[in-house]
Amino acid sequence: MFLYVVCSLAVCFRGLLSLSLQSSPNLCPGVISTPYTLTCPSNTSLPTSWYCNDTRLLRVTQGTLTVDTLICNFSCVGQSGHRYSLWITWYAQPVLQTFCGQPSNTVTCGQHVTLYCSTSGNNVTVWHLPNGQNETVSQTKYYNFTLMNQTEGCYACSNGLSSRLSNRLCFSARCANITPETHTVSVSSTTGFRTFATAPTLFVMKEVKSTYLYIQEHLLVFMTLVALIGTMCGILGTIIFAHCQKQRDSNKTVPQQLQDYYSLHDLCTEDYTQPVDWY
């Protein structure tokens, strides 16, 4: 029974068992000889531990880490104990980047994606490459879109200084029928961008189903724990009642015990001493 309780608690509080659990690496495209800021995806302002090839960086406790062409496989651990891997791949300009905490292999249908073309050139073009075709989607360093069937595929950028395209960032989505939204983006090389269009709430059937199963699983465990606690309370009540009954009997005097005995004897023999009518 103890093992059953431990297993039930492990299901309910699975976060307790996720210490130092490795997640899939977040691939972060970086520009050679250019500082790159890594952000730990733990979403917490509490102290964070950073590691370089499993060697802890003792002086770094913030949620961000700025590096400059350092050959390391970085990882971070938040207060929850979950471990995230952040791998940087360095490229020569131009380099198409996205938030390191939101790599292309983790973006799901309906999420916003921000692309940034890191280059010293000013004649920047961001390309969408569906089915091998080159489609211009932005002529600024920033491009903001929502991942859906119409926007999935690979993206790259160019800087006008050479014919070479940047690295490719590819996104895959299997969405329900969702109408793409139009973004109006204002870009500045110093202030970044602002999005004026607001996105409607998007519901993905897969995510809804997953949430339903998650709630159903925890509800089943909760009901099982309630039934287990009720059973244990019933057993405990029976033990307490028996103990009290025994204690009360032990406090009775000998005459009282004899009186109870003869009263019980008369009750048991009363039905057998009644006269019988013969017809």
Curated annotation (Swiss-Prot):
Residues 19-220 are extracellular. The keyword Cytoplasm does not apply. It holds the Pfam family KSHV_K1. It comes from the Viruses. Promotes host cell survival pathways and may contribute to pathogenesis by preventing infected cells from undergoing apoptosis. Acts in host B-cells by mimicking the activated B-cell receptor complex. The cytoplasmic tail of K1 can induce the phosphorylation of a number of different kinases, leading to the activation of survival signaling pathways. Homooligomer. This is Protein K1. The gene is K1.
